Regions:
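C-terminal regulatory/interaction regions
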Residues: 2-19, 225
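Active-site HxH/HxHxD metal-binding segment of metal-dependent hydrolases
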Residues: 34, 45-48, 55-127, 206-210, ...
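Residue-level signal for inorganic ion chemistry
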Residues: 40, 52, 78, 90, ...
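Metallo-beta-lactamase
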Residues: 46, 124, 134-225
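Hydrophobic residues in well-ordered beta-strands that form the structural core
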Residues: 51, 98-100, 148, 189
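Hydrophobic alpha-helical positions that pack around
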Residues: 130
Length: 225
């Protein structure tokens, strides 16, 4: 039986303005693999995006309709099937364009590169290319909020033993991109694998072994066990 914390997400999602007064953020727990799909919207302009649509698409679209959002883009944090399986249906239902990293083998309308900035209404999403879990992995940042897909979880990181995975690349993604961000950066991952639904980079630096000070070789050895 699911615990009450997960039940509350199934019934209500997160429906609070976490970023600033004009922006809506919804973290939606979907499917049997504990995936998170995100709906983010400019409340004033009534436009938004969806990150990683997979299952429970009626639930996702209910959130969109309830907030009267015109979904402009679908972002994929990487090309694994459990983060992209809902792309086609959501695109058909909303007319949204699919955005993924330029190296992603999946069908996309727009190819994103490192440091690209995509504007949706007043919202500006910055793309960080963060290979390691997957060659085409990206993180998306708006204000102090970072959507990490399977690159970084609460309390852990994405596995690197799947096709396209590389512990060396993941180490570099952490060292050169994520660890350079402010400690107050809020982490929203691609799965509900941690003890908490979301975290901060400062907290993860202290408690997540993946971000502990260590050499690249030490990190590779840990990830290869």
């Amino acid at each position: 039986m699911q615990d009450s914390r997960i039940k509350s997400f199934l019934n209500r999602i997160i429906s609070a303005s976490y970023l600033h007064s004009a922006v809506l953020l919804f973290q939606i727990l979907v499917g049997n693999l504990k995936n998170f799909t995100y709906v983010i919207g400019d409340e004033a302009a009534k436009v938004g995006i969806i990150i990683d649509p997979s299952w429970d698409l009626d639930k996702v679209m209910s959130t969109v309709r309830r907030n009267k959002l015109d979904v402009k883009y679908i972002f994929n944090t990487h090309s694994h099937w459990d983060h992209t399986i809902g792309n086609k249906e959501i695109a058909n239902r909303t007319g949204a364009k699919i955005i993924a990293h330029e190296s992603a083998p999946t069908l996309k309308d727009i190819s994103a590169r490192d440091n690209d900035v995509i504007e949706v209404g007043s919202l500006k999403f910055k793309v960080f290319h963060t290979p390691g879990h997957c060659l085409d992995s990206i993180c998306l940042m708006i204000d102090e909020f970072l959507f990490t897909g399977d690159t970084l979880f609460v309390g852990d990181c994405g596995r690197t033993d799947l096709p396209g995975g590389s512990p060396a690349q993941l180490y570099d993604s952490f060292a050169e991109k994520i660890l350079k961000l402010d400690d107050h950066t809020r982490i929203y991952a691609g799965h509900d694998y941690g003890a908490r639904l979301r975290s901060t980079l400062g907290y993860e630096k202290k408690h997540n072994r993946s971000l502990q000070p260590q050499s690249k070789q030490e990190f590779i050895e840990i990830m290869s066990r």
